[in-house]
Amino acid sequence: MELKRVVVTGLGAITPVGNGVPEFWENIVNGVSGAGPITHFDASLFKTQFACEVKNFDVTKYIDRKEARKMDLYTQYAIAVAKEAVADSGLDVEKEDLNRIGVIFGAGIGGIHTFEEEVGNYYTRQEMGPKFNSFFIPKMISDIAAGQISIMYGFHGPNYATCSACATSTNAIADAFNLIRLGKANVIVSGGSEAAIFPAGVGGFNAMHALSTRNDEPEKASRPFSASRDGFIMGEGGGCLILEELEHAKARGAKIYAEVAGVGMSADAHHLTASHPEGLGAKLVMMNALEDAEMDPKEVDYINVHGTSTPVGDISEAKAIKEVFGDHAFELNISSTKSMTGHLLGAAGAVESIASILAIKNGIVPPTINHEEGDDDENIDYNLNFTFNKAQKREVNVALSNTFGFGGHNACVIFKKYAE
């Protein structure tokens, strides 16, 4: 069976550095940090008092307020990015076979705010007997965003959620890619969203010592590959990619951002939350993706790394890149856009895939910000080009995006410049 080619025809993003793809791209190219004091709740007693929050989000631009009240914030973000991406793709839904359009859209955590709020209300009022919101369960569960998107458009194709912590939305893109190239769908709305900047989310990650505590200068806290890094910054938002079978896209005259070349998946099988110190899973997932794409490592121009600004993770990923790419590792560009967006958890892969695609489209690699002279880690080879502090112009024909999740889940997707 000949596999079908898959292209990207629409993009949508809600992020801490911009609502909508154009604003997101402009800000990451210019090295703008989305970090600041937490406003979603009073974090004054928490070890970490800052995050990368979405700003000025108005859900009524996407759905009416009555419907929004039935959704957790993470689902509202999902609806917003899906609507932007579908509109961007130019799909005329009324002319499409809706049985051939699917939605694969995930969340690493899901409706934690809804859960926290409802359980809190129960303990506050428990002497009155149990009383829960009738939308408690559908607001909370991590599959509901995919369901809501399909209901909104009437898409009857493959529909489910992925959940693999921070690898979630890359896995969603990978599944969408595989289903389309196997002929199971013409179009799939893929991606992920997250909204976990609430007491349980921040407190839980603080308890694991995963978050930066640089409260005096939040905008400088995410500093991947720098010696003084002390953990990641929580982010929120969503990203959506419209994946489409090539001939279907051409038949309707769609613009094509890039082609999906290959995907990889692997497991560290090492620790609940820490990366394998030698980058075993990271190495394997990149090799798997390159093999799937039938691509020589020397063809890769840019790697959007997982790069969370954690002590172990950054070292292991840099080691893995050197092992997989050999001498070519010193020729390509590497950057962590998490230095600006923070870590969007289950939405990270989709948002970083968008950054990778736009690097191909525009010939610009966004930077890894916040590296300072002398702040070098003896365990990291700085002959690698981490694109520190300033975007770099270069031709990008192939971009690879890594995402690694708690539990040892690793996912990788490779995009390439579209050519007939």
Predicted regions and their residues:
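Conserved beta-ketoacyl condensing-enzyme motif
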Residues: V8, E23, V29-S164, S193-G204, ...
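ACP-dependent fatty acid/polyketide chain-elongation machinery
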Residues: M1-E67, E247-Y257, I354-T368, K416-E420
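Glycine-/small-residue-rich "gating" segment that lines the acyl/pantetheine channel
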Residues: T124-N133, A174, N178, E194-A251, ...
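Acyl-CoA/ACP chain-elongation machinery
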Residues: T39, K184-D230, V263-P277, G307-D314, ...
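Condensing-enzyme catalytic core mediating Claisen C-C bond formation in acyl metabolism
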Residues: R5-T9, G36, D216-A293, Y302, ...
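Active-site-proximal alpha-helical scaffold in enzymes
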Residues: A78-L91, A145, S150-Y153, P158-E194, ...
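Phosphate/pyrophosphate-binding loops at sites that engage ATP/ADP/AMP, CoA/4′-phosphopantetheine
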Residues: A85-D97, A249-I256, M286-Y302, V324-H328
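Flexible, low-complexity linker/loop segments at domain and module junctions
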Residues: M1-V8, K95-L98, A293-E299, F330, ...
